[in-house]
């Protein structure tokens, strides 16, 4: 039991303090708010198996309506998908017919079904000039294992869908995504002590069994086939077969994507 003594600064407690010293008892409404917040967090982070997609976009070339450069135009593409931004190399002096042949691997978060594409003219002494743009919905046929090779209209200063067209080759792969398993809140039983703070209801955890992501199934179409290597070797007779094999494996057996990657390697060399 605490006792009180007098000092020059007034009375002070010494010894054991009472149980309710500097404690604020939460009201029923405050406890309910805390439980609601914990329940909302549990719903947000429910440990379910989600699915994310990996989209392969090959930015092949564009046919633009006008050359906006003073002497030359050096276009490059920028793609915004979700919160991620991807860019192609600059097609130096590409003018109205730039070619990139750039393969971009994008991760599609759940709920995202489109991306935004812009074409800029790279400037040396001023801000890069945006010359064309378009909003592209990801085709549903990609999820059926098909490839899409299409020309998409571009908008710009000439008007909507009047700035030219851009050629894109797209393919899609499903990727399992594991979200963290959160404990389940059963009931508040413990109070966290603190000076001047409302005690926080402590949950009882039911961790459950840890979830393990199943190994991804091997798609026979993604296995490296000798006929694919021979086909690409005929297109690149001077290329080392082992280089072709490694690029093909890196592209998951996608022959078109491997060809685009090798084209980019040849251009960069």
From Swiss-Prot:
Motif AIM1: where in chain: 133-136
Residue ranges annotated as motif AIM2: 151-154
Biological process according to GO: autophagy; inflammatory response; innate immune response; phosphorylation
PROSITE patterns, per database record: C2, CUE
Keyword flag Repeat: yes
Keywords: Autophagy, Cytoplasm, Endosome, Immunity, Inflammatory response, Innate immunity, Repeat
The keyword RNA-binding appears for this protein: no
Subcellular location: Cytoplasm; Endosome; Early endosome
Functional note: Component of the signaling pathway of IL-1 and Toll-like receptors. Inhibits cell activation by microbial products. Connects the ubiquitin pathway to autophagy by functioning as a ubiquitin-ATG8 family adapter and thus mediating autophagic clearance of ubiquitin conjugates. The TOLLIP-dependent selective autophagy pathway plays an important role in clearance of cytotoxic polyQ proteins aggregates. In a complex with TOM1, recruits ubiquitin-conjugated proteins onto early endosomes. Binds to phosphatidylinositol 3-phosphate (PtdIns(3)P).
Subunit structure: Interacts with ATG8 family proteins (via AIM motifs), and ubiquitin (via CUE domain). Found in a complex with TOM1; interacts (via N-terminus) with TOM1 (via GAT domain); the interactions leads to TOM1-recruitment to endosomes and inhibition of TOLLIP binding to PtdIns(3)P.
Protein family: Belongs to the tollip family.
Record remark on domains: Both ATG8-interaction motifs (AIM1 and AIM2) are required for the association with ATG8 family proteins. The N-terminal TOM1-binding domain (residues 1-53) is a disordered domain that partially folds when bound to the GAT domain of TOM1.
Name of the protein: Toll-interacting protein
Classification lineage: Eukaryota, Metazoa, Chordata, Craniata, Vertebrata
Name of the gene this protein is made from: tollip
């Amino acid at each position: 039991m605490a006792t009180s003594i007098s000092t020059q600064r007034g009375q002070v407690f010494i010894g054991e303090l009472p149980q309710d010293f500097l404690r604020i008892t939460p009201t029923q409404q405050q406890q309910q708010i805390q439980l609601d917040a914990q329940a909302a967090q549990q719903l947000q982070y429910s440990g379910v198996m989600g699915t994310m997609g990996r989209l392969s976009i090959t930015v092949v070339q564009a046919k633009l309506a006008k050359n906006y450069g003073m002497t030359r135009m050096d276009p490059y593409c920028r793609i915004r998908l979700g919160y991620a931004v991807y860019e192609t190399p600059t097609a130096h002096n590409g003018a109205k017919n730039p070619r990139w042949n750039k393969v971009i691997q994008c991760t599609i978060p759940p709920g995202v079904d489109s991306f935004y594409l812009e074409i800029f003219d790279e400037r040396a002494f001023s801000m890069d000039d945006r010359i064309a743009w378009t909003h592209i919905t990801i085709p549903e046929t990609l999820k059926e294992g098909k490839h899409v090779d299409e020309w998409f209209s571009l908008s710009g200063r000439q008007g909507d869908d009047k700035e030219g067209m851009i050629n894109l080759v797209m393919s899609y792969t499903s990727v399992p995504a594991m979200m963290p398993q959160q404990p389940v809140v059963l009931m508040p039983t413990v109070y966290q002590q603190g000076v001047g703070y409302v005690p926080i209801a402590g949950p009882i955890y039911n961790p459950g069994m840890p979830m393990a992501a199943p190994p991804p199934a091997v798609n026979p179409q993604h296995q490296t086939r000798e006929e694919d290597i021979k086909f690409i070797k005929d297109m690149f007779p001077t290329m080392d077969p082992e280089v072709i094999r490694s690029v093909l494996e890196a592209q998951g057996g996608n022959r078109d994507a491997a060809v685009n990657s090798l084209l980019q390697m040849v251009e960069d060399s």
